[in-house]
Design a protein with these regions (language model features):
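Periplasmic/cell-envelope proteins involved in peptidoglycan metabolism and beta-lactam response
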Residues: 1-296, 384-396, 405, 504-507, ...
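Extracytoplasmic
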Residues: 49-52, 59, 66-72, 123, ...
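Soluble non-cytosolic domains of exported or imported proteins
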Residues: 51, 85-93, 130-135, 195, ...
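Beta-lactam-recognizing serine transpeptidase/beta-lactamase-like catalytic domain environment
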Residues: 65, 220-234, 238, 271-317, ...
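Preference for bulky hydrophobic residues occupying beta-strand positions
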Residues: 73-75, 174, 245, 311, ...
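Bulky hydrophobic/aromatic "packing anchor" residues in well-ordered structure
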Residues: 140, 172, 205, 339, ...
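Residue-level detector of short coil/turn "hinge" positions at structural boundaries
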Residues: 151, 270, 334-335, 397, ...
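Ligand-recognition elements built from short beta-strands and adjacent flexible loops
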Residues: 505-508, 522, 531, 552-724
Length: 724
């Protein structure tokens, strides 16, 4: 019996010795097998790394669009409970400590956090918030690590697109929407959060703006705490590229303001305009608006069609200078030749001029806008030459701008023309164009005959500001000689000096332009509507060496305003005047007489209407007021503050019950808009404006007792109500 016992002891001893030796050898001499053994126990999860969508800037570097990422924050109460026991701490004391840390590192209220931690005892994990910003999250993680507090879990929640200038360029910039990409086998994720551009620049450059997902492997223990682990893999996310546009937001604002004003004044269905640098093809402003745009949510405006690219219209008499190009080029007319105008019979069709002018020279035909004169010249040009010239000017095809929604226009081949098409084309009928096509064609007239490719993105940069791609002017082709285009420009200058556009002539800058009026085509037919028109004006300045080409068009303006000379031309003039008054904007040919009589525009925002009128009257400004109300304050003005203004140029003052949110935060002497701000941020803004606060609740400010934009009087406190 004793020998058997000794034998068993020896056997177990040897087994223990062999096992210990094996483990020792495995750890010292064969770490890879041990590592594989560990991997059998811990299978890493993959955490998705979401890229930040790229930002969009204007030509001056002003931010137009950016992104904010939000994260979800959860607390594992089981882990906190175990930690509290180890620390010999009451659970409520532990919750209070966590609440304090979170509130100190974010805009969250400690009281609200504590309430959430005590909700529903059956839940192990409690969501604290899904609106934690990245900087707040970094502070929270750092503090939890420093104080060795367990139970913190976080994940990406959402991304929000911020349009810094509100409704400005809304249709051009477009919009995004969150989408799910479905299951991704690489990251083993069921859905990938993504903001997808659905219209405008956001959609056209979506692949560049979106960025690329990344991932990293993470290992959790039984308490769902991350644990350090060797040899984990990671693929960094790539943030989206940034876009710098050719759009000058100051010019864009001037254009949009004039278009909104005109849309209301002339009761138009839609209004559009494009400003282009003819020497480069850079688009300086591109706007399309409807009268109701300012009364609806900006998000709804962003998804509307980009009118200057998509809306097709017959250009009317604005086509006449372009018809004259091949006639001069092939010497089919002489500069001093007189052509009989007034009435012209073509088969069964009678072509008439608005007025019976008699015989006119080519310059007078353009200045007086004679249909008969240009139709007779078109007969000399012939089908083939006119068709080829219009094709070389870009009609019937997209411009190559690269934005979604651009139309090609409608321009039939000569085989599809009838006996009247040649004559109709000469004065802008039987062809449909877009504003972009038209302004690009006239830019070639402005620059000496070079057809430039229009572009709207100046450069693409990464998040560090490094230029990835710089776009340069591109000449597509020569459409005429400089001598011919100079002559056409002189004809267009005669329109302003002595013709149909003389009412928009300015003392301090020369303009070459052309008015146009066209009946709208009845959809699905070749007939025309009796009461619906498109009015157009295209001009360039200074006339001698144009630095800008500007086209304005109205879709279905009210009767009496349906002529290009009565709606589009006055709007053109207003835009040009306001551009010329922009600080630091130098147009060659700009007469010094204007600067000698200019005054600096005062900042009237936030002032009571009576105060604003007193200031304007003191300096002799001409002005008009929109939305008059005896209790109103100035909520907007045009031109903006500190701009040099001709006192004889009418100023527009818009009044209402309060300023916009952005203005209310900066205008002194008025109540700022605190809604949507955190309590901490609201306190900072209120202190800057010297407004005492009474605070109810915590989290985000939802209501305030003093209306934004109201004049601040005395020391009355503003009560704000906040909630998460």
């Amino acid at each position: 019996m004793r020998s058997r016992y000794i034998f068993l002891v020896i056997i177990f001893g040897l087994a223990t010795l062999v096992w210990s030796a094996y483990l020792f050898a495995l750890q010292i001499f064969d770490p890879f097998k041990l590592d594989r053994f560990r991997q059998l126990r811990y299978i890493p999860d993959k955490e998705i790394l979401i890229p930040t969508r790229g930002s969009i800037y204007d030509a001056n570097g002003d931010l137009l669009v950016s992104s904010i990422s939000y994260y979800q924050l959860d607390i594992d109460r089981k882990a906190v409970s175990l930690w509290a026991k180890k620390q010999k701490m009451d659970l409520q004391e532990a919750y209070a400590r966590i609440s304090k840390v979170l509130s100190n590192c974010s805009a969250l209220s400690a009281g609200d956090i504590l309430k959430r931690l005590n909700l529903n005892d059956k839940l192990t994990s409690i969501q604290i918030s899904n609106k934690i910003r990245e900087m707040e999250l970094d502070r929270i993680i750092s503090t939890f690590d420093k104080e060795k507090i367990p139970g913190l879990n976080y994940s990406f929640a959402s991304m929000r697109r911020i349009y810094s200038k509100d409704i400005l360029a809304a249709r051009l910039l477009g919009s995004v929407q969150p989408v799910s990409d479905g299951y991704d086998p690489e990251t083993r994720s069921k859905s990938l959060y993504k903001l997808n551009g659905i219209c405008g620049i956001e959609a056209s450059y979506n692949d560049l703006l979106a960025g690329e997902y990344g991932w990293r492997e993470v290992v959790y223990d039984a308490n769902h705490e991350r644990v350090p682990y060797p040899n984990l893999h990671e693929k960094q996310s790539q943030d989206g590229f940034n876009l710098k546009l050719t759009i000058d937001s100051k010019i864009q604002e001037i254009v949009e303001h004039a278009l909104y004003e005109g849309a209301v004044k002339y009761s138009a269905k839609n209004v559009g305009a494009i400003a282009m640098d003819p020497n480069t093809g850079r688009i300086l402003a591109l706007a399309g608006v409807s009268p109701e745009d300012r009364n609806i949510d900006p998000g709804l405006v962003r998804v509307k069609s980009n009118i200057p690219l998509s809306f097709m219209f017959e250009p009317g008499s604005t086509m006449k200078p372009l018809t004259m190009l091949p006639a001069l080029e092939h010497k089919l007319v002489r500069p001093n030749e007189k052509i009989a105008c007034g009435v012209y019979q073509v088969g069964k069709r009678t072509i008439r001029d608005t007025h019976h002018y008699g015989a006119l020279t080519p310059k007078e035909i353009i200045a007086k806008s004679s249909n008969v004169g240009v139709a007779k010249i078109a007969e000399r040009i012939g089908k083939k030459r006119l068709y080829e010239k219009f094709i070389s000017l870009g009609y019937g095809q997209k411009t190559g701008l690269g934005l979604y929604g651009e139309s090609s226009g409608l321009f039939r081949k000569p085989d599809d023309w009838d006996g009247y098409t040649l004559h109709s084309l000469s004065f802008g009928q039987a062809i449909s164009v877009t504003a972009l096509q038209h302004v690009t064609a006239f830019s070639a007239v402005a620059n000496g005959g070079k057809m430039m490719k229009p572009y709207i993105v100046d450069s693409i940069t990464n998040k560090t500001g490094q230029v990835i791609q710089q776009f340069e002017p591109e000449v597509l082709r020569e459409i005429a000689s400089k001598a011919v285009t100079d002559t056409i420009r002189s004809y267009m200058k005669a329109v302003i000096d002595d013709g149909t556009g003389k009412h928009i002539k300015m003392d301090y800058i020369t303009i070459a332009g052309k008015t146009g009026t066209a009946q709208k085509n009845v959809e699905g037919t070749r007939g025309y509507s009796s009461g619906k028109y498109t009015s157009v004006f295209v001009g360039m300045f200074p006339a001698e060496e144009p630095k800008m080409v500007l086209l304005v068009f109205y879709d279905e303006p009210a009767p009496g305003y349906h002529y290009g000379s009565t709606s589009a031309a006055p709007t053109f003039k207003k835009i040009v005047e306001d551009i010329l008054f922009m600080p630091n904007y130098n147009i060659i040919g700009f007469d010094e007489r204007m600067t000698q009589r200019s005054l600096q525009m005062p900042d009237l925002r936030g002032k009571h209407i009576s105060q604003a009128e007193a200031i304007l009257n003191k300096y002799g400004f001409l002005y008009k007021i929109e939305g008059v109300d005896s209790s109103s304050v100035v909520i907007d003005q045009f031109p903006k503050a500190n701009v040099s203004v001709d006192p004889h140029h009418p100023i527009t003052i818009k009044v209402g019950s309060g300023l916009s949110k952005a203005d209310s935060l900066t205008v002194k002497g008025t109540m700022p808009d605190l809604t949507g701000l955190t309590i901490r941020r609201a306190m900072q803004v209120a202190a800057k404006h010297k407004v005492p606060l009474k605070i109810k609740g915590s989290g985000i400010v939802r209501q305030q007792s003093i209306l934004p934009g109201s004049l601040i009087t005395g020391t009355a406190a503003c009560t704000i109500e906040a909630s998460i």
